[in-house]
Every structure is written in C-alpha cells, then in structure tokens.
Amino acid sequence: MNKYVLLGVTALIMAMVICVEANDGNSPSRKMEEVHRESKLMITKTTVSIICASTDYKQDCTTSLATVRSPDPRNLIRSAFDLAIISIRSGIDRGMIDLKSRADADMHTREALNTCRELMDDAIDDLRKTRDKFRGFLFTRLSDFVEDLCVWLSGSITYQQTCIDGFEGIDSEAAVMMERVMRKGQHLTSNGLAIAANLDKLLKAFRIPFPFLRSRRGRLGILGSGSSRDESVGSSQDSPPNEDSSDDSPSTVDSSENQPVDSSSENQSSDSSNNRPLDSSKNQQMESSEDTPKKSAFSGNQPLDDSSDKLPQKSTSSENQPLDSSENPPQKSTSSENRPLDPLRKLNPLNKLDSLKDRHLSEEGEFPPWVTPHSRRLLARRPRNNGIKANVVVAKDGSGKCKTIAQALAMVPMKNTKKFVIHIKEGVYKEKVEVTKKMLHVMFVGDGPTKTVITGDIAFLPDQVGTYRTASVAVNGDYFMAKDIGFENTAGAARHQAVALRVSADFAVFFNCHMNGYQDTLYVHTHRQFYRNCRVSGTIDFVFGDAKAVFQNCEFVIRRPMEHQQCIVTAQGRKDRRETTGIVIHNSRITGDASYLPVKAKNRAFLGRPWKEFSRTIIMNTEIDDVIDPEGWLKWNETFALNTLFYTEYRNRGRGSGQGRRVRWRGIKRISDRAAREFAPGNFLRGNTWIPQTRIPYNAN
C-alpha cells in the first residue's frame, strides 16, 4: 500500500477515535480503554508498515517492531536499531554455545570464534553510535547527519560479515553454523540501513518537523522541511558517543534523517556467502616461489619499468627532501562548481608523481574536514626540522622515550580528545601493532616511508591464521593519522593472505606512506579513509575491504606473483546495495615493478574483482600502464555479482586504459561528468566542506 494511503488510513483511525470519545462520553471507562488500545494498535501497525516499506527483509522488520508498543515513528525507528543490537548479541551468544565443542577441539576454530566475538562487539558499537546520534536528532545539514548513520550501519554490516568470513578455509561447517545464527542480526542491520537511507522521506511522510537548533548567537531557530541538500552547511564531526553505553533495550527516541538510495541498478543482496579464495590461480594447489623474501623486502623503493610509459621513475619517498618548501607561492582556491572536472587540464601532478615531495603542503589544504587545523599543521611539517612536537619518541637505539611502538601506544590516554603524536625514528620495527578503539586521535610520524618501517610476517599459511589477524599494523581508533611511514608484510606470495595494514578507524588519514606486501596488502576494512601520496604494492587483491576509501595521487604497483597466479589490484567488499562504501582511485597511477614486467603476459593483471555482491570500485583521472589486461576486470567465479557490482573507469590515461576490449558485464558502468562528481573526493568523503585556504592546487572534483 502506498505510504500516503497508509497515512490517510492513520488519520481516519485517529478521527474515529476522537468521534468515539466525543459521542460516547458516558460509556464505561473499560470500553473507552479498549477503543483506545485497539486504535493505538492499528496506528502502530500502520506506522510500522510505512517504516518497513523500504527494507529488503520486511517480515523481519514488521515482526520485530510489532513488539514495540508505541505509535510514535521516532520511537519505532530507534527501536529498530536497538532490536538489531539485541539480535546480534543473541546470535553471537548462541554461536559461542553451538561451536564450543568444535572450538575446544580445534585451536583455529577457537581463534576464529574469539575474533567473531570481538567483531560483534564492533558491530554493536556502530549500531549504538547510530542509535545515540538518532536519539539526539540535532543537525544543521540533514544529509551529513544521515551520512554518519549510513557509514556506521555499513560498518556494522561489514563487521558481521567479517566474522563469518573468518571461518572460511578453517572450518567451513562452523561458517555455515555461524551464518545461520547471525542471519537475523544481519537482516535487521540491513533494514536499519534502509530506514536511514530513506529517512528524509519518512520525516516528510510522518510530517515530523526538523529539530530546533541553537544558533551561534544563542537564539533558537528551526530548520525548514524540504530537501536537506540545500540546508546550511554544518559539521558532521561529532565526537564518538559513550562507548560504554549499554542501554540496548527498545525504548523511546527522537527522530532522524536521510540519504538517497544508491542510484545504480542493483538487486537485493543474497544471503549466500562468497568468500575470497586463497589466491586467484587456476591451479589452486600450493606452490613454491623464488620470489618469497627471506628478509625485510622493502629497504627501498621497488624499481619501476621505464619501457611502458614516459613517467618519471624516481623514488616517491620524501625522506631526503622536506615537504615544506617556500618556493611554491600560495595559490587561490577556485570554486568547485566552476573548476573543470578533469584536474589534469590545469595541473598534471601524476606526470610529476615523484616530485610531489617538493610541493608545499599547507596546514589547511588537501585534507578532509575532520582534520583539524592543528592536525593539518602536523601533517605539513617534518619532525627533524622541529616542526612537530611529539608526545612520545620511539627509537630502537634507545635515544627516545620508548624502544617499541607498543610501549608508546600504552601511553595514549583512553578516549583521548587531542592529537597524540608518536614520532617513530628511522629503523625497521618488527612488532605487531594495534591502535585500539579507545586510542583516539593518534598520529604516527616517521622519518620516511623507506626509513621508518613497521614489519611483520604473519600469514594464512602455514598456521591457518585468519586474514583479519595477519595484519602487521591494525588501526581501530578513530581520527588516526600516519605520515612518512612504511607498513609491510614479508610473508611472501607462497603464504597467501598476509595483510600489512588493516584500517577500521573512522576518519583515518595516511600521507606519504608505503604499504608493501603480496596478497591482501592493504585491508581498508570499514569507515571513512583518505590516502594521499601513498604507494601500495602487491599481487592479489592488494587493496581490499569495505571502507569508504579514497586514494588521491597514489601509486599502485603490481609485483610478481606465483607461477599460476593472476594479479588483481582491488577486491571491494560491499555486501548491501545501500552501503555508502567503495574504493575510489583518483588522479593516481597503476603500474608494475621490474619483477612483474617479464611475466605480465602469462600472469595477467586486472583492475579488480567483486569480493561481495555489490562491490563498488571507481577509477578516475588515473594513469594506467599496459600492465593491465585489456579486459580490465576479473570474475570472482562464473556469474557471481556480475549484475549487481558497480565498476567504472572515467577519464583515465595510459596504454592500459583503453575501453575497446573491456568486459561487458551489466555492472560495468559508463558514467557522465555529473555522475563522476559524486565519486570525486569532494563529494564521496564530503570534501566539499574542506577549508579552502590552501597554498597548493586542490581540486575536489
């Protein structure tokens, strides 16, 4: 039934109640109570139907909200998030019981189950943040408010799926059992995302007024209804809610807001789990590789071939030249509306990719809006030039306060609200580093991405360690930054999944960093992430995950794989069609190192493949060398996600960018200039609200 018809029915019911009360005033109180109760139930049922109309799992939505005895749509929407939390907690508790005997008998199943418990806590945290922000229901820009809700709900979906994926290759029967007990929680979270994505329509349908907000001068003002995109710009940089909040029972709530549903023609996600194989080789058996490193493999930059392009082949590292340079005069920022979409018409930084280290990075430019002016100053300076005042210095030779990064992280105040700078001096640090969820506003500053290197060698083989646990460095604390650091995993191609860096933090920024490995080098796991002037190398799926990640002016280097393997740059893991996530490669370069070029005809390389049903990858204004196969994209299997994925290439250059022989799947899109702007950093990461005062050219489009 159309929602407006339902509203009419609701109004009619309310009118009937009023008439009964007016004309039957002398009736017994019991009769009046029954009429009230029945009318309230009918109104609640109608309201639930309207709320659930946009969801993919309507039966789960209506049956769960039927337990909430409130006709107020705001209470019902908040209860939808609460009920998802309860369902997830119930599911993981059930899973811990059902899998106990298997976990007791097998160490790897036990570790996967423990990882699941941790991930479910993270999924619940994101739902709590959503619920708490909805409870406050204060905003100056509806679209920014909904953006936060959708990012966190997308994160919750990803955490739940990561739990299930963790059993693949370890205990497939346990994976099936866990998927079964977690299914309802996944469905309710997906429904929550659908509700959030259509929140503006719900507010209008229920005629819920936008909230009163206090202006800067202290006067109260009310935001008018209508399109949220035309409202005054506000901040979406709210501090994280109290993580210790445990009020998860359905209760009363205020209202909230919305973001449009993804415009691509995508179908409803299936429940089947398609998990990433150990490698992409046609022959799946284990093979040795002469390229498996026997020590830290990244003491310097990998040589780049100079036969396939005309780009400079110098090092992209900046340790020998300071970023600050007074030679570059300030340049005025131009309006993003009047600026040409292709920044290369006026500026071609890609052809000078290796000279970016000479450009002056101002304290207020080039960074997303969550980067404070203080943090921008820190990113623009070099520690040895006394530009950064570190809270802690880490040095292997004992010249700092700490000898290990773990010791320095132990000094970060819990739920820190100010930037905590850790200067990591030159050296190779072989330690497993974790920035926990309670370590907020942490910043790593090194002496150069080839001089300060954090390394590890944990991999799936031979010990069957889950991909999530293989990371040399794991970043979970929000507002994390890293500058001039190298991250690597030296396990080698023969040991399959081996993550150098996993990022689950919201508002994470990486500048002039290297991420080096083979399979699964960089795990962009969840939330909003921005990479600038970075270098990522690997073989299979070496940028993967389900974050909302933008790579700007970065370099992606394909390395030599095992004998029968193919190389894939990206494997994006968007599972729900309404998730706002995706991988955007903007104004960058995709190339191969010297070891790969001799085998590129036999070991073909592709831009990406779909890890999950609604995988979304956008490559724009990027130099693509002839290391990429003319077909461009690789199937996961014969038919999986070919109709539901969203892959597009826009205004790229280079000998590997030709579209004539690209695959012709339904999910491969050709987009207009206007559509491309939605994926440019300014819009995709809300970068159009960045502070415009910059001394270097900046183009949000």
Swiss-Prot record:
GO molecular function: enzyme inhibitor activity; pectinesterase activity
Record flagged with keyword Glycoprotein: yes
Polar residues biased stretches: 276-287, 313-338
Glycosylation sites: 267, 637
Tissue: Expressed in flower buds.
Keyword GTP-binding: no
Name recorded for this polypeptide: Putative pectinesterase/pectinesterase inhibitor 43
Species annotation: Arabidopsis thaliana
